[in-house]
Amino acid sequence: MTTAPNNGLPLTFTLWKDQTPFTGQALPGLPRLTVYLPSEELNSGKAVIICPGGGYGMLSVPKEGHRIARFLGSQGHAAAVLEYRFAPYSHPIPLIDAQRAIRTLRHQAVEWRIDPAQIGIMGFSAGGHLAGTAATFPRIEAGLVHDAIDSESSRPDFAILVYPVISLTHPCAHLGSRDNLLDKHAEQDLAEQLSLENAVTAQTPPTLLIHTNEDTGVPPENSILFYQALRKNKVPAALHIYEKGAHGIGLAANHPWGKAMLQWLDNR
């Protein structure tokens, strides 16, 4: 795949050219990536892969995907909306999709005028859990097709987690996301491993966390847990908890988190 988006129009393609690993009859056409490139005059060289939310049971693509990508593009950042597989697919399938997306952007970096050392991942709600998993978990070897894309690193250079699901075991856990992500026969140990406050290391990339105090769907304790783990491991991190805003706020009009994100990106 060597085609680049033209005339400011996005380019959509499936992540694997031929056979998608672990594919089944569900969710035909997924996983796929839609890439938005900024104008040459504004291009910062940074790229952000966006994982929409949806509790690992659907994807909120318009609000937490394409709208975010267009916003980032207007500010000079490349963006790619990842439509990853969700239930009935369970872990590690969404993570395999996210890692392939990161490797794909890195493989296309020269053609798409992206700095391969400035590729980050962003996620909302359960998509924030997926982005956080990509930022903390090692490369998944299962399902690799060993093409030129798979030779690239799957580690993101930064992460932006917006009202993310973090824990699958803490009282603040979002049980719907946990039930959709984990096979019903999964051991408790796997839920502990996928509680991302337990997965942070000194190698975790710099992370921005966004949450609101009014979020009752995924309480802000999720972001607090992750931030505390980042601090413990001396990972550069910023946490913004705003007073107003319900869960799933997206880029609501006049909400300040979008501006805070751009400022944080400028400092990377």
What are these regions (language model features)?
Residues 18, 164-199, 205:
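Mobile cap/lid helix-loop segments that gate and shape the active-site cleft of serine hydrolases
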Residues 36, 220-268:
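C-terminal catalytic histidine-bearing segment of alpha/beta-hydrolase fold enzymes
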Residues 203, 209-211, 215:
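Short beta-strand/loop motif that positions the catalytic acidic residue
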Residues 168, 214-218:
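Acidic catalytic loop of the alpha/beta-hydrolase fold
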Residues 2-42:
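N-terminal cap/lid segment of alpha/beta-hydrolase-fold proteins
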